[in-house]
Curated annotation (Swiss-Prot):
Upper lineage: Bacteria, Pseudomonadati, Pseudomonadota, Gammaproteobacteria, Pasteurellales
Molecular functions (GO terms): ferric iron binding; ferrous iron binding
InterPro entries (UniProt xref): CyaY, Frataxin/CyaY, Frataxin/CyaY_sf, Frataxin_CS
Gene field: cyaY
Family to which this protein belongs: Belongs to the frataxin family.
A Pfam family assignment: Frataxin_Cyay
The protein's name: Iron-sulfur cluster assembly protein CyaY
């Protein structure tokens, strides 16, 4: 994946997060600022998803800690084989929001 594809992929992922949260009536607000995507919950807690362009990685920070994901076999996966969508679902649940992502 080149840098342009990386940014396009992440932008599509961020769009999908917003759409899926909306579709599930989640009590969360999404905000994009440059390379950072923030999900803020009613209690003001946050999940932060950011682009790491030099590494072509996607990082996720939440109450559960921080995870790094690389693009492998058409999916964002961390070093332990956890899919980004599964980690995001778990992170949202840790913030009190019962949602699931594809």
């Amino acid at each position: 994946m080149n840098v342009a594809e990386f940014h396009q992929n992440i932008d599509q992922l961020w769009d999908s997060i917003e759409e899926q949260l909306e579709a599930q009536d989640a009590d969360a607000d999404c905000d994009r600022q440059g390379s950072v995507f923030t999900i803020t919950f009613d209690d003001r807690s946050q999940i932060v998803v950011n682009k790491q362009e030099p590494l072509l990685e996607l990082w996720l920070a939440s109450r559960l800690g921080g995870l790094h994901f690389a693009w492998k076999n058409n999916d964002w996966v961390n070093g332990q084989g956890v899919r980004f969508w599964d980690a995001l679902t778990e992170a949202c649940q840790a913030h009190g929001e019962q949602v699931s992502f594809i």
